A protein has these predicted regions:
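Short, solvent-exposed loop/turn segments enriched in Ser/Thr/Gly
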Residues: 148-152, 182, 274, 319-320
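Glycine-rich flap/beta-hairpin and adjacent strands of clan AA aspartyl proteases
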Residues: 144, 153, 162-250, 338-396
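Extended C-terminal subregions enriched in glycine
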Residues: 309-333
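Short conserved beta-strand and strand-loop elements enriched in small hydrophobics
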Residues: 80-84, 151-159, 218-220, 263-266, ...
């Protein structure tokens, strides 16, 4: 009886929003220091942390566990706010096109999981729309793991409420999640990427027919002093965020936000991917990632040196650095040095970090390139679920 009552209340809540029409729904995105930047300021190497994690963490073969080697939240900087439960409990989440599940820390978190206690935690006992599930949940990332159990409640994103199955995390890797500015992750990927066959949040939203179009778009401000840091738009795009027209590419494989790339050039020289390769468009990543050997050559070309926190260049040389161009759908998408250099002022002087990372993904998934937030900041990006395509337009 209690279960039916909960569902009835959910339906009443949902029905009250149907009359709002097909307006664009907006989620403000905040930009905060990444885990890597936080560790660096503490004098800790993120790479050393990952090495220690890989040595200490045993392989996990439990039911429901899906390795996600492409997802690395060390450099994630953008997140937005959602609510779960009735009354609303607020959480800051990464909207990640590289995954499809929603997870947030649980009030039932293990006392040994220190990362849980530095974040907002969902308390099922305080929500009258909570429905128990209890199925175990586990996901392994390149930078840590998340374990817990499934629950169901009302989730509100951009003013749109949906009845959603999500994961309550009872155990989070202390490194690196204890330093994360976000509470959890909301996957914007396709259903076939979801663990345990859970219907993703955006699919639940689409099923309500409250959006004008079955798309979402992501804008990241390139101005470090600009607040907010960006916006996730559900149902369409905002012409205030771009100039010219969108150029579209069909997704390479049904169910994944990835496309075929036809080359990467540095300056005027075609250097990588001339025979074609896969490019993943990933809002969960802040940097651009490519095969380690290719990124190493690229860094040598621009005179970058690798240290414990990434590739660096002499700040005096930044203005002379070449553009890096990606060839997608017959179009050229060029990043200037202003787009791929992160300029940070420190007490001891300015530091210029190159926002590229090397990552070898084995076949059949790899090798791949991952175009993250520094690419999306330059090219406003539309993710079109109805037509299974991705569009790019020059961001303002």
């Amino acid at each position: 009886m209690a279960l039916l009552t909960n569902y009835w209340m959910c339906l009443v809540t949902l029905s009250s929003t149907v009359t709002m029409g097909h307006a664009l729904r907006r989620i403000t995105l905040k930009k905060m220091p990444s885990i890597r930047e936080t560790l660096w300021e503490m004098g800790v190497s993120a790479e050393q942390v990952l090495t220690e994690l890989s040595q200490k963490s045993p392989s996990d073969n439990n039911n429901g566990t899906v390795p996600t080697p492409l997802t690395n939240y060390l450099d994630t900087q953008y997140f937005g706010e959602i609510s779960i439960g009735s009354p609303a409990q607020m959480f800051n989440v990464v909207f990640d096109t590289g995954s499809a599940n929603l997870w947030i820390p649980s009030q039932s978190c293990s006392p040994f999981s220190t990362a849980c206690f530095t974040h907002n935690r969902y308390d099922a006992s305080k929500s009258w729309t909570y429905v128990e599930n209890g199925t175990g949940f586990s996901i392994q990332y390149a930078s840590g793991n998340v374990r817990g159990f499934l629950s169901e409640d009302v989730v509100v994103v951009g003013g749109i409420p949906v009845v959603q199955v999500f994961a309550e995390a009872t155990s989070l890797s202390a490194m690196p999640f204890i330093f994360a500015k976000f509470d959890g992750v909301l996957g914007m990927g396709y259903p076939n990427s979801a663990i345990d066959g859970i219907t993703p949040v955006f699919d639940r939203i689409m099923s309500q027919h409250v959006l004008k179009e079955e798309v979402f778009s992501v804008y990241y401000s390139r101005d470090p002093k600009h607040s907010p840091g960006g916006e996730l738009v559900l149902g369409g795009t905002d012409p205030n965020y771009y100039t010219g027209n969108f150029n579209y590419m069909n997704t390479k494989e049904m169910g994944k936000w990835e496309v075929t790339m036809k080359g990467v050039s540095v300056g005027t020289e075609m250097m990588f991917c001339a025979e074609g390769c896969t490019a993943v468009i990933d809002t969960g990543s802040s940097y651009i990632t490519g095969p380690a050997s290719a990124v190493s050559v690229l860094m040598k070309t621009i005179g970058a040196q690798l240290d414990e926190s990434g590739y660096k260049v002499n700040c005096d040389t930044v203005k002379t650095l070449p553009s890096v161009t990606f060839y997608l759908g017959g179009q050229e998408y060029s990043l200037t040095q202003e787009d791929y250099i992160l300029w940070q002022s420190q007490i001891e002087g300015d530091v210029c970090t190159v926002t590229f990372r090397g990552l070898d993904v084995p076949p059949p998934t790899g090798p791949i390139w991952i175009l993250g937030a520094n690419f999306i900041a330059r090219f406003y990006t539309e993710f079109d679920r109805r037509n299974n395509r991705i569009g790019f337009a020059t961001a303002v």
